[in-house]
Amino acid sequence: MASSSPATVIVEMDEPYVQAILLRAFGKYGSLINTQTAQEHGSANSTGSSSSSRKLMHWREYEKIDWDSVHRSTSVFANAYCIRKGLIRKAQMAFNIRLYTAKHPESVLKRGVPETWIFELDDIDYLDEALMECYEVEEGMRHNEDVEDPALRQQFILKPSLTGRGAGIYVFDTRERLEELLEKEFESDDEQEDEDAEEDESGLQTSGGGMLSSCQAVSQIREWVIQRYINRPLLLKSHGERKFHIRTYVLAAGDLTVFVYRHMLALFAPHPYKQSAGDLDDHGAHLTNTCLQAKLDGFDESKAVDLFWNLDLPREKLDHIFDQICRILGDTFSAVSSESTSFQTWANCIEQFGFDFLVDEDCNAYMLEANAYPDFKQTGENLKFVVEGFMAASVATAAEKLLLDANDVSQDVQKMMDHDRNDLVEVFARKNKRSW
């Protein structure tokens, strides 16, 4: 019998796919954890303050977490950090990494992140001024004017700083193409603003932990990053020589320990990749995001996602890629956690992130971006066990470190938690961190 009243966890996720997995993961703890939906709890904003000894955890969408209660009480927990724009906002993360590598030139981030420029533009008429801050990009486009072979051109990729799910991403290699892309974005922005003014005067709507939804005009903030495009990606004959990226699930816990979940995913583009091809509008060859692929004709989930460890590569190469990913992630969290204005960790919070990596033909791994509240459903039904395993590992971490008292944990429960956390690999632990 438990020596204290059980902790309560309120699970309220918008995606039924995730909600069901979480309820099952918490349900394994039986009477040790009182798991409820928001409806069952009786109030979406309840803090459980009626019992001072009771522990309460919000496992919810970011916008639904009662941040006041999480901040006030050490016995109220959350599945997200309140401030983490330094990680999930592409421009802010690029800025933090730039600061970090200036102080730590030996860091793996000097090589493990594509060359990145922060690009801000309020009006297309000021493109010249904006490009002055991205001199190397302008030089690359000027160089390309005299290069007829697309394979020999310098290529770049434009990404909105705030959006997720592949929205608003374009590959370009000339000034003319960049202008066309930006003009289209500014036009769609104006149209969307007119619609939003009629529907909602409150401003930006968000989803996925503060990110703009993919259906919105992606340039409302008018902040992008430009990255040097990795135009020689690793291609596998067993997968039709299609470009792919690696989705890595990461758990950040407390203040601050970071774990990588070993079972990573490989997400493939639907069309074969040909470096010599000049069609940069062929998203089916260049972009690997399954949210975009689902809109294309002939989308086949079984061909879009595979297990990283099942890829047709020698084991030593897979191990080499995984080791790079772990080291890159360790230094990434070291970089962002040193900038407290844009990334603050609380001892009573944990958070799941999805990181995307690309591997080049020489098996060098590059971190592309980080996503809060990753789109777990893109894993699909065939590989659902990967999400289930990561959720079980995350729940076990929350149970052991936050929710359960040591004298309430039997040997069987401890074995279950150890088993569920077995595939978490620690990649970073902040020095002088506050205790759980």
Language model regions located:
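Amphipathic alpha-helical protein-protein interaction segments
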Residues: V11-P16, N79-L87, E106, G168-V171, ...
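Conserved N-proximal alpha/beta basic substrate-recognition cap immediately N-terminal to
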Residues: S3, I10-G164, V171-K184
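Short acidic (Asp/Glu) and glycine-rich catalytic loops that position anionic groups and cofactors
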Residues: H71-S75, W309, L368-F376
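Catalytic core of tubulin tyrosine ligase-like
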Residues: V147-Q154, S161-I350, D362-N364, S394-T397, ...
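Generic preference for well-ordered alpha-helical elements
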Residues: E15, Q19, L23, G86-I97, ...
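Hydrophobic residue at the +6 position relative to the catalytic HRD Asp in the kinase catalytic loop
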Residues: F355-F357
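C-terminal active-site "lid" helix and adjoining low-complexity regulatory extension at the edge
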Residues: V359-W436
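Active-site-adjacent bridging/hinge elements
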Residues: E63-H71, G298-D306, M367-E369
